[in-house]
């Protein structure tokens, strides 16, 4: 399973019994469901439409949709969240767009999937739902950091948020071949590259947004990670873009 959760649009009402519990799926409602619930859903296009959401899309959702870190992470027991009155025309358009983009543009598909997740009004519940359904500590911690990359994160902050000891987190990350320091650096550097590529901020602002108090330290960290300074990286991007434009002309 490569996906974290699935978004389901209900075309016809039906009920499911899961773990001796009846779940009613009402027509024209939107659900975000766990893998366990997804595997119980009928394979019937006339009853429902499904879009699976992968880890990369979830992490982009945390960064791009101006989310706030949940004040408390609650263990997902239901396996789903329902949105009973979504804007139908927009939902239809998103599902159709995702279907078309699936074979043409992964970038566009990701953007449309992010818009689909944003349809759920209970944003904090959705954020918590996604994080509890991510199956690796690496992605879980990356997701938490992504809510506020500018914050000065420490391992104890993560431990308090997910009600787990620091030693257990270290062990789980070691088993996954990484560490908290590496995850924090990777998340900051990927975000820095994204901001620099957008050409919307000065290097000073990029450093601040990525959690660095010192611009010079950020520049050194960026060069150590990517092999070039932020300004040289941007020049390379511009050079590639100019080359593409000349080819098109």
From Swiss-Prot:
The keyword Transcription regulation applies. The keyword Manganese does not apply. Coiled coil: none annotated. Residues 156-177, 203-226 bind DNA. InterPro entries: Homeodomain-like_sf, HTH_AraC, HTH_AraC-typ_CS, Tscrpt_reg_AraC-type_HTH. Keywords: DNA-binding, Repressor, Transcription, Transcription regulation. GO terms for biological process: cellular response to phosphate starvation; positive regulation of DNA-templated transcription; response to X-ray. One of its GO terms (molecular function) is sequence-specific DNA binding. Residues 139-236 form the HTH araC/xylS-type domain. Encoded by the cryptic lambdoid prophage DLP12. Induces the synthesis of acid phosphatase (AppA) and several other polypeptides (such as AppBC) during the deceleration phase of growth. It also acts as a transcriptional repressor for one group of proteins that are synthesized preferentially in exponential growth and for one group synthesized only in the stationary phase. Also involved in the stabilization of the sigma stress factor RpoS during stress conditions. This is HTH-type transcriptional regulator AppY. It comes from Escherichia coli (strain K12). The lineage of its organism: Bacteria, Pseudomonadati, Pseudomonadota, Gammaproteobacteria, Enterobacterales. The gene is appY.
């Amino acid at each position: 399973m490569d996906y974290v959760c699935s978004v389901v649009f209900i075309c016809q009402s039906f009920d499911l019994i899961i773990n001796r519990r009846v779940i009613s799926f009402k027509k024209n409602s939107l659900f975000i469901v766990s893998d366990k619930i997804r595997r119980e859903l009928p394979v019937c296009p006339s009853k429902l439409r499904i879009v699976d959401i992968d880890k990369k899309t979830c992490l982009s959702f945390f960064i791009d949709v101006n989310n706030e870190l949940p004040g408390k992470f609650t263990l997902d027991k239901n396996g789903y969240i329902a949105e009973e009155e979504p804007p139908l025309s927009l939902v239809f358009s998103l599902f159709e767009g995702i279907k078309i983009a699936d074979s043409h543009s992964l970038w566009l598909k990701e953007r449309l999937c992010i818009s689909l997740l944003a349809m759920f009004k209970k944003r904090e519940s959705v954020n918590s739902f996604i994080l509890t359904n991510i199956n690796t500590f690496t992605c879980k911690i990356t997701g938490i950091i992504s809510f506020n990359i500018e914050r000065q994160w420490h391992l104890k902050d993560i431990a308090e948020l997910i009600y787990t000891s620091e030693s257990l987190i270290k062990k789980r990350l070691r088993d996954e071949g990484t560490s908290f320091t590496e995850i924090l650096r990777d998340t900051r550097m990927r975000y820095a590259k994204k901001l620099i590529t957008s050409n919307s901020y000065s290097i000073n602002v990029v450093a601040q947004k990525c959690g660095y108090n010192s611009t010079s330290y950020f520049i050194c960290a960026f060069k150590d990670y990517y092999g070039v300074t932020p300004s040289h990286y941007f020049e390379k991007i511009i050079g590639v873009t100019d080359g593409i434009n000349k080819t098109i002309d």
